[in-house]
Amino acid sequence: MKPLIVLNFKTYAESTGENALRLAMAAKQVASDSGVTIIVVPQIVDIFYISQHIEIPVYAQHIDGIEFGGHTGHVLAEALAQAGARGTLINHSERRLKLAEVDAANEAAKRAHLTTIICTNNIATTRAAASLNPDFVAIEPPELIGSGIPVSKANPEVVTGAVEAAKGIKVLCGAGISKGEDVKAAIELGTDGVLLASGVTKAPDPKEALQNLVAFV
Amino acid sequence: MKPLIVLNFKTYAESTGENALRLAMAAKQVASDSGVTIIVVPQIVDIFYISQHIEIPVYAQHIDGIEFGGHTGHVLAEALAQAGARGTLINHSERRLKLAEVDAANEAAKRAHLTTIICTNNIATTRAAASLNPDFVAIEPPELIGSGIPVSKANPEVVTGAVEAAKGIKVLCGAGISKGEDVKAAIELGTDGVLLASGVTKAPDPKEALQNLVAFV
Amino acid sequence: MKPLIVLNFKTYAESTGENALRLAMAAKQVASDSGVTIIVVPQIVDIFYISQHIEIPVYAQHIDGIEFGGHTGHVLAEALAQAGARGTLINHSERRLKLAEVDAANEAAKRAHLTTIICTNNIATTRAAASLNPDFVAIEPPELIGSGIPVSKANPEVVTGAVEAAKGIKVLCGAGISKGEDVKAAIELGTDGVLLASGVTKAPDPKEALQNLVAFV
Amino acid sequence: MKPLIVLNFKTYAESTGENALRLAMAAKQVASDSGVTIIVVPQIVDIFYISQHIEIPVYAQHIDGIEFGGHTGHVLAEALAQAGARGTLINHSERRLKLAEVDAANEAAKRAHLTTIICTNNIATTRAAASLNPDFVAIEPPELIGSGIPVSKANPEVVTGAVEAAKGIKVLCGAGISKGEDVKAAIELGTDGVLLASGVTKAPDPKEALQNLVAFV
C-alpha cells in the first residue's frame, strides 16, 4: 500500500504566500513522480492561491463547526470548499477545540464534502475522536512534536494502540517524522500515512526531503 | 468630513466566495461614485480572491498575535499582507481575544503594515483598547448587535463616551447601523465612521443599501 | 432500581454560601427519607463549608486536567478531594473543555479517587466521552436546557441513543427535568438517573421539589 | 512606606489543603511580627478553610465576570465574598482572560467589595489594565516568571514604565522575586509591593523565606 503524506505548512516563513506556492509545486512534482498522494495544508489565506494554480489536494489547517451566519473571524466549511480546499485538519495540537466543537467541525466539513482528519494526543483521545466518524485520525504525542525523534521509533506502542483504538477509522501518525524510514515504520505499524511539517518545510531543500520521504515505496 | 464605512462580510451565504466577490464589486462602485471610502472585510479564505480582482481596501476579520513559526490554524500578519489585506479587525465581538492577545495582535498587524481596528463593547474597554495605540477602535454595544436599532440613536452617550475615552484614537461605531441617517448621526457624535454587516450584506439589494448609506454625504 | 439525583447548584443566589448549605441540608433529608442517593454540586468555593457540615456526597462543578504545579486559578483534583469533594462534573455545557482537556480532567479526577461525570450534548459526543472511561456520562441536549421541557419527553430517542452509544458506561440525562415523572421516564429509557438544576434550586420550596422528584420510587 | 506582599499559592502540593493552612499561618505570624501586610492567595477551594481559621487577608486566584445565574464551574464574586475572600487576582498569566472579561471581572469584584489586582505582561497591557480602574495592576514579564531572576534587576525599565503607564493606579511587580533586596528594589522603582509564589511556597522553610523578604523594612 502506498502511504498518504500530509504536509502541514503551519505558519513558517518558508511556507507562507509565494513560498507556499513554491512548496506546493515541489510537492506536486514529487507526488507525480512517485505516485504517492501528498496533501498540502497551507494557511487558510493561501488556500485559494494554491488551489487555483496547482493540481494537488489542498486541505485547511482548521475549520469551525459553524453554519452560514454571524461568525466573524471563523472558518466556514462552504467557504473553504469554494476556495478549493478538499479537506481539513481538525483539533491540531496548536489549535485544540472543545469536544463539542470537534464534533461540530467534523459535521460541518462533511456537509461541504471535505475530508476530515481529527488530530489527537494519545490513545484515549484517538478512541474518542474515531468514535465521531471522521475520515482519518492523526495521532501526535505532544512530547515528540518538533523533537526530530519519530513517534514510530520512540513509542511504537502508542501508534499500534491508536490503530486498534480507531476501530477501522484510518490512522495517520505524526511528530518527529522526517525520513523515508519513518514513513515505512508508520505503515508497518498499521497506519495509512503520516502528518508532518518542519521535517520538510524547514529542510534546506524541501523537494529533496519529500523525495527521500517517498523513496522507500 | 467623509465617513469611513467598514463592511464586515461575516460568514453569511450572501457574502461568501463568489457572492463575496460580487458584494465587493458593488462596494467598489458605490465608493467610486460617492467618494466615500468603503473597506470590505471578507472571510480570510476569500481575501486573496477579492484583492486580486478588485481595487478596494480589503481587511481581515481576525488576526493572531503570532510571528512566523509553528502556529497551525492561526492567522499570520505577513500572510494576510502577502494575500493583499491592508488591515484587520481585532477582537470582534464574535471572536474575542485575551487582553495580552489583543496587544500582540495589534503589534503583529503593525509589523506587517496592516491598519488595525480593535473592537470593544463599552466605554471602559474602549479606553483600554485605545491605550494599546491601534489605528481605530470600534465600539459595538453587544445588546444592540443585529437589533436594527442604531447605537447612535439607542445610546448616543456610549458613542460620545467612547470618543472621549479613546483620547485621540479614531473611533468607529457599530451595532444596528443600516441607514444613511445612522452614519450621519455617528459622525455628528464624533466618530470617523461605522462598522456594519447584516444591514448591507443581507439587504435585498446590497448595492442600493450601500448607496443609501452614503447618500447623506 | 433507585435513580441517582445529581443536583447542580450552578451560581444561583438561591444556592450560594449560606443558601447552598441550606439546600444541601434539604437534599440530605430527602435522601435519608427516600433512600434515593442525592449528590449536591455546589460552587467550588462552597465545597468545604458543605462537606464539613453535612453528610452528603458533594461533587465539584468543574475540574482541570492538571497536576500539582504552577496553575493559578485552576481546579486541582487533590485540592478538591482534601476539601471533601467525592466527584466532579467535567465539560458541563456552561464550562466546555477541549477534547484533550476532557481526557486529562477525567484522569486527574481518577488519580484523586473522584467519581467523574462527563457532560455531553448529543449522541456522538456521548459515544466519544464514554470511550474515555468516566464513571458516568450525562447527556443534556442544549436546546432543552432551562426549557422546562424534559428531555425524556421531548426527545426520548436521544436518551436511548446515548445509552446505547455509552456501551456500558452509566448514563444520566438532563435538561428540563423538574418532576418525579421525568425521573421515572429517564430510568425507563435506560439511564441511571438525572442531572438537574433550576427545577429544584429555583423552586419556591426546593425541599418539596426534591420530595416530588423522588416520590415515584 | 511598607510594601505589600501578595503570596500566590498556585496549585503546589506545598500550598494545598492542610499545607495551605500551615503556610497561611506562617504568613500571618511574619505579618504580625513585621507590620508588613501579607495577602495570601490560595486555591479557591481552600479559601473558606483558611479565612475561617486565620486572621489574614485572603484573595482568590481568579474570578469570572458573571452575576448570579446559570454559570456552572465559574467563580462568582458574591460567593467568594461570603467565603471570606477580600480580593482577587484577575488575568493572571496562568489564567488569562479576554479583554471584555477582564473588565467584567473587575466590575463583578467591585460589586462584592473585593479588592482587585489585574495582572499584565508588559507596559502596554499595564496601561490598558490600569484604564479599567482596578485597585492594583501587577506586572509580570512572562520571560522572567519562575526564572529566579527578579524583574526589578533584569528589567527595571519595564517596572518604572509600568508605574508611569498606570497613571496613579497602584502597581505591584512580580516574576523572579524571592529576596528582601528584590522587594526593596521594587519599592524604589515606584511600586507598592510584590506578587510572588514559588520563591516562598517552595522554599525549604517558607516562614524563613517570608522573614527574609520583609527583613529590609
Predicted regions and their residues:
Chain A
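Conserved, mostly hydrophobic/aromatic
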Residues: K10, Q43, L80, E140, ...
